[in-house]
Amino acid sequence: MIIDVIIPAYNEQDAVGKVIRALPENMLREIVVVNNNSSDATTTNATAAGATVLQETRQGYGFACLKGIGYLKAKATPPDIVLFIDADFSDQPREAALILEPIINGRADMVIGSRAAGNKEKGSMTIPQVFGTWLATTLLRIIYKASFTDLGPFRAIKFCKLLALNMQDTTFGWTVEMQLKATQQKLVCEEVPVTYRKRVGVSKISGTVKGTLMAGYKILYTIFKYS
């Protein structure tokens, strides 16, 4: 099975290399970092760590993910599975094998790394993040009958299934769009507990009041948009 990784990155010069080097290289064909308008050494450090680096000038988490997907889709041999992980080193890259295993062994089409079901370092998620995740997953359960406990970015999905989702969101609604569409298309989804720690540096989303409010609004908007 061919497995590639997409890592969206915005000003993560201190963390991105750590993420790349900690991933299980023996399981992966290519690690793709999508630099999303960083003003620091994210590109330089990601390249030095051995990743392929793409540039996405349109600001937004979803834009970065879509750029990576387009790159993999255009390859002579696209991947069977794509793994997503953030560039901030808050997730444990070595746990990628846990997320990939259900797909590799044919039990699932998509796997979400659940911080809610795993071990969270104290202070790794803010109170608004915890409440927002609870609210979003509760709405997913009520509206879509979807049994998720988290919207965490650490996840894997069969590439053909990902393309069939026709992902559209360009900012903060990316993860919830993937999960609700996967439910609508009756993909076999599984969650695995993951370890979550304080990120390297300050979050560009939860680290500011504006970022938290914008992310929360977009997630709720996306949930109701497809209902």
What are these language model-derived features?
Residues 57-59, 63-71, 93-172, 199-210, ...:
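Acceptor/aglycone-binding surface of glycosyltransferases and processive sugar-polymer synthases
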Residues 2-4, 177:
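Cell-envelope/extracellular polymer assembly enzymes that use nucleotide-activated donors
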Residues 76-90:
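Short beta-strand-to-loop acidic/aromatic patch adjacent to the donor-nucleotide binding site
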Residues 11-25:
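Short, well-formed alpha-helical segments that are part of the catalytic scaffolds
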Residues 35-43, 89:
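A conserved acidic beta->alpha catalytic loop
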Residues 29, 43-75:
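Conserved donor nucleotide-binding strand/loop of the catalytic core
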Residues 14-18, 40-49:
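Acidic helix N-cap motif at the loop->helix transition within catalytic regions
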